Amino acid sequence: MKIRENIENFERIKLNKVAKFSDESVGRERLEEPDEIRTCFMVDRDRIIHSKSFRRLKRKTQVFIRTYGDHYRTRLVHTLEVSQVARTIGVALSLNEYLIEAIALGHDLGHAAFAHIGEDVLNDFLPGGFKHNEQSVRVAKKIEKNGLGLNLTKEVLDGILNHSGFSNVSKVAGTFEGQVVRFADKIAYVNHDIDDSIRAGILKEEDLPKNIIEILGASGSERINTLVKDCVFNTIDNIDKGEPRVSLSKEIGDAFVQLRKFLFDNIYLGKYLEDERKKAEFILEKVIEYYYNNWGEMPELYRNICEEEGIHRGVTDYIAGMTDDYCTNEFNKIYIPKFVMY
């Protein structure tokens, strides 16, 4: 018996009945021979980690643009924190940890430069709109490996596609593992963005709404602990009642929504980031404008997309893959004069 089959058999003994068993995956778009030692979701995890798009996350903004401190989150650090939170919840629920890890590590592969500012600019540019979760799937299916894609399992792609959305009416992933990542993403970013905001001097601990802090906890670690435990125990209750879904309790969920709204009002859309937001928008818009008019200068992969799917699509894919630094350097290369000594 192969090592992979031993792992799959162990899943049958260990995992919850609502988990996604690796040997029940609906598969990939392109058929492949199974790996001898890794399950299909382990293979997906490894492909994501070794992809160029994953490495570029270290140079993409989470919230604070061009911060020079060593401890502010980048998109890569956010991704790793999401993976940690999601795996903690998943192990407590006896779900498939490898599927959770693959979805969590891949969920932001398509995020643009300059955080959600890049997403907003590309959304205005691309007919039909731009969403980072959809772009993450596109990166995995079409952009990576020079257009071949990573050929991930459909469960991982589904989890990546449906990790966004905060309301109860948002579409959810078809697996419990995907639903866990959706909550872990929110738990991670709300709490680490508060931490970064305090580090940047925008917020003080005492600025946080007292009624919310009394429910969720005074520190970041306390809030994460509260949210993770509530998610685990409330989900167990749901399963026991025949309602198989991942969720928070009403009290904790309502407090969490209020805390997120506080962040949007005071940080994401607040005055502190307004000037930097305008600068980032200007850089992105000018680089987009240049390559829209000169798309023949883009790498071959994106030129081919322009010919097959239109210039807007090809330029969007190229810009979305840029890091903050690369996009800024492109702007400087295109628009800033080079000073030459005569």
Swiss-Prot record:
Residues 75-190 form the HD domain. The keyword Ligase does not apply. Keywords: Hydrolase. The keyword Hydrolase applies. PROSITE patterns: HD. One of its GO terms (molecular function) is triphosphoric monoester hydrolase activity. Belongs to the dGTPase family. Type 2 subfamily. PANTHER family: BIS(5'-NUCLEOSYL)-TETRAPHOSPHATASE, SYMMETRICAL (PTHR35795:SF1), SLR1885 PROTEIN (PTHR35795). This is Deoxyguanosinetriphosphate triphosphohydrolase-like protein. The lineage of its organism: Bacteria, Bacillati, Bacillota, Clostridia, Eubacteriales.
